[in-house]
């Protein structure tokens, strides 16, 4: 029994990062600590071994074969960030919209890897829009992991920047929680609503809670309300112990008229409208000011 237990620990340790990736769900008690439902195709894709993958496909392995929890070889290639392997699988008919037991799509997995070329490839074979019934959002995952290029790609394909997931919040809120400064800036510039977070908890609440001074400063520059209260009646100032953030919140002065106008125009235009500002025939300097260039 001890031998079996030890062997199980080896397997769990080896694939621990994948349990984290897909939520750690086990479809059957018989499969606990085992990967017997995986095929050599899955292993080759995960490890980025192009030649073995090509050989297995030529031998007739089913490109769409999924494990009990719905993981396909394409998911594996995307998790590993292996562009050429994913391209080969797609050329052989892999389903770019396949969904795992935990709701992860190949696009979600590609965003986890942070490979923008791979994300772009998957987007040519699938929709960028996130199904309402899935909790695994590619945009949120890219934002949480600091993959700015992936965030930009998704938004350029029309993904809703202010999509709020239950108990998770918006992508901006997630980026503030992990202090991903570049992603926070990118999301704000590309039209994220600075007040949309998780329920009444705003991105500024999140940034102050985790001591994100740079994030808090960016949020204030884009019009965040430092007096807003969450469901517990707390303001961002109430949630921080960071002295630099406290100083920032307490000394923030009255905004200039030009700033107020910029925020008002940006909110009126929204995410889609910001992409069409060139049609407004504004002076070059004013156009750049509006877009924070």
Curated annotation (Swiss-Prot):
Keywords annotated in UniProt: ANK repeat, Endoplasmic reticulum, Repeat, Ubl conjugation pathway
Main location: endoplasmic reticulum
Domain SOCS box: 244-293
Residue runs in coiled coils: none
Description of the deletion phenotype: Morpholino knockdown of the protein causes a reduction in specific Delta-Notch signaling.
Pathway per the UniProt entry: Protein modification; protein ubiquitination
Tissue/organ expression: Expressed in the developing nervous system: localizes to neural plate margins and is abutting the proneuronal zone.
Protein name: Ankyrin repeat and SOCS box protein 11
Source organism of the structure: Danio rerio (Zebrafish)
Encoding gene, per UniProt annotation: asb11
